[in-house]
């Protein structure tokens, strides 16, 4: 049970500018067809945070905006409400809800995405008009999914509107995949050289390889990923950090720069020994960062946040669409967060006290 002080401390944990999208999923090779599945970068980020948030107060600290059009399915509203987050629905029945198609093509069964209806972006003014100035001032972490140029605009807007000028906003930035490449390196570096905010950049390994002009192919070994992670050292201001997401290889955290330099730590993927349980990677990266964001907001620990990011992503990729949630038992696909934490630590061999780690996330 959380006391009054804890409730105050956790009421503004994470907010995202990621969108809600209604997804259709087509995987003809396996005769898989799904309609009206909740999706989008914002949705999966919040889901990832929910998987880590075992308490109702923590879940209410997750803030996001869902834009509803005239065709918004009622069953999706019930699904979202069951998660217990601080979701705000904005209605505009003159338009259709943002909709997308996830489809797979080629011999490699490569996942593709396209919008089927116009998208509606979320910016800082939207956050303030929806949640109020006080919530933005108290926010522990801002999850951004956008290009480098838009990230700069959002950071400038945050600094402009924040009432408390003494505290640096913490930005957990997921660069837009198509614009994370060598052609856009200057924009991304401009964000990472900022010293008036704390930025934690998180591209995946394939995007990072393109960012440094190396290759469009995803690195396939941990050694390649570690070499890639080291390239971010001089790319960033000494106070900024990076989480390199490496798919089935897990993640590598690149810390702020200490007197002896940065630290580089590897965290295995949740299903690195149980790959047969991975059915669809859609939303895995977004949910990783949602789990990471809420954990970092609570603990300020890159290690704990990386563990939780991998756990959240592991739950998301176990099915097509979103995981099955039981709000009474607080299980995702039938498993509690505590049991997932125990499983992950036992499989990975990471030396952490489970009780202390769990307590740091549920205080």
Swiss-Prot record:
Sorted alphabetically, which InterPro entries does this protein's record hold? Answer: Mak32, PfkB_dom, Ribokinase-like
Sorted alphabetically, which Pfam families does this protein's record hold? PfkB (PF00294)
Q: What does this protein do?
A: Necessary for the structural stability of L-A double-stranded RNA-containing particles. Necessary for growth at 37 degrees Celsius as well as for maintenance of the killer plasmid.
Q: Which family does it belong to?
A: To S.pombe SpAC4G8.14c.
**Can you name this protein?**
Protein MAK32
Species annotation: Saccharomyces cerevisiae (strain ATCC 204508 / S288c)
């Amino acid at each position: 049970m959380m006391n009054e002080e804890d409730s105050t401390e956790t009421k503004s944990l994470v907010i995202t500018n990621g969108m809600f999208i209604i997804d259709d999923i087509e995987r003809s090779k396996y005769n898989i067809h799904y309609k009206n599945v909740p999706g989008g970068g914002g949705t999966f980020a919040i889901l990832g945070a929910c998987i880590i948030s075992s308490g109702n107060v923590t879940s209410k600290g997750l803030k996001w905006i869902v834009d509803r059009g005239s065709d918004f399915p009622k069953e999706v509203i019930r699904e979202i409400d069951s998660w217990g987050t601080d979701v705000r629905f904005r209605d505009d029945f003159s338009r259709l809800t943002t909709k997308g198609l996830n489809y797979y093509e080629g011999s490699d069964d490569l996942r593709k995405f396209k919008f089927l209806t116009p998208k509606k972006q979320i910016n800082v003014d939207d956050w303030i008009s929806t949640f109020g100035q006080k919530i933005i001032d108290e926010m522990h972490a801002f999850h951004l999914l956008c290009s480098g140029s838009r990230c700069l605009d959002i950071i400038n807007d945050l600094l402009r509107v924040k009432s408390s000028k003494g505290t640096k906003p913490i930005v957990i930035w997921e660069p837009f995949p198509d614009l994370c490449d060598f052609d856009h390196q200057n924009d991304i570096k401009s964000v990472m050289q900022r010293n008036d905010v704390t930025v934690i950049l998180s591209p995946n390994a394939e995007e990072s390889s393109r960012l440094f002009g190396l290759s469009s192919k995803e690195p396939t070994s941990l050694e390649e990923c570690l070499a890639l992670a080291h390239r971010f050292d001089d790319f960033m201001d000494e106070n900024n950090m990076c989480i390199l997401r490496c798919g089935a290889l897990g993640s590598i955290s690149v810390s702020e720069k200490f007197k002896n330099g940065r630290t580089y730590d590897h965290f295995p993927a949740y299903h690195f020994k149980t790959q047969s349980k991975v059915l669809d990677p859609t939303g895995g990266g977004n949910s990783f960062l949602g789990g990471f964001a809420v954990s970092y907001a609570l603990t300020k620990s890159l290690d704990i946040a990386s563990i939780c990011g991998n756990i959240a992503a592991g739950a998301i990729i176990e099915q097509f669409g979103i995981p099955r949630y039981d709000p009474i038992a607080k299980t995702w696909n039938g498993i509690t967060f505590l049991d997932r934490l125990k499983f992950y630590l036992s499989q990975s061999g990471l030396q952490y006290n489970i009780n202390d780690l769990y307590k740091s996330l549920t205080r």
